Amino acid sequence: MNQTLSTIEELLRIPAPCPGPMGLACDGPDLWIGSYDTCRIYGMVAMQGRVFEEATAPGRPFGLTVTGDALRVVVGDRDDGGTDDRFIRRYIMGKDFKSDAIRCPGGTGSFLAYDGDRLYLSQRDAQVILELDDAGAVLRTIPVPRQITGMVIVAGRFYLVTTESRESDDYRLLCLDARKEEPEVHELASIPFAARSLGFDGTKFWTNCRGENTIVAFAKPD
């Protein structure tokens, strides 16, 4: 953990509705959680901890984001052996996954963010965010100084959970403004656990503490 940055201000922790929570997205007062272990997604009322919807994913779910009345979900192979091609799948809330799929560029990708117009995909090892068109073609590549383990767009800026490497326990919250020709990056806070995914409900951030099967809400740094 970084000793020079202030630590995030935790507001509450709630049990995850599943083991191995990986993906997370906010939809008003509701959370959507994807489980690496069960290969299912769960809709839950955050402050009640009540699951109101769940569905089997067509693979192992990673990052997800809300796009209107649907979710976009990065899905990988269930089998840990062999190749792990990643696809972006569409889940219609209250219904099921649709058959259409967009292959992630290079077959790899982890987390998603949506700005109301375009979809963005992170690639952890490449340390980039890819802006995608509707067909999944790359419109822009945004470099990031650290590996991304969660992201969300708030007021036009990317907020990122990051780490130095897969072996590091130094997790940090970054703000990246990519609207300028040269993206501006600011480190905001240290995160004292291995966080996965990032959502924002309008007032506070949410992330998964996968190792403890909990979901953590924390204050938005000034």
Positions of predicted regions on the chain:
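A short helix->beta-strand "capping" segment at the edge of beta-propeller domains
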Residues: 1-17
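Structural motif
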Residues: 40-43, 81-89, 128-130, 168-174, ...
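Conserved beta-strand positions in repeat-built beta-propeller and related beta-rich domains
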Residues: 33-38, 73-84, 119-126, 160-169, ...
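Beta-strand-rich domains and repeat architectures in extracellular enzymes and scaffolds
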Residues: 13-36
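Blade-level signature of beta-propeller repeat domains, shared across WD40, Kelch, NHL, RCC1
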Residues: 196-222
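Surface loop/turn motifs at the tips and blade-to-blade linkers of beta-strand repeat domains
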Residues: 12-17, 54-57, 101-106, 141-146, ...
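Repeated scaffold domains used in trafficking and secretory/extracellular systems
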Residues: 19-25, 59-67, 106-115, 144-155, ...
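Short loop/turn segments that connect beta-strands within beta-propeller blades
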Residues: 45-49, 92-96, 133-137, 177-181, ...
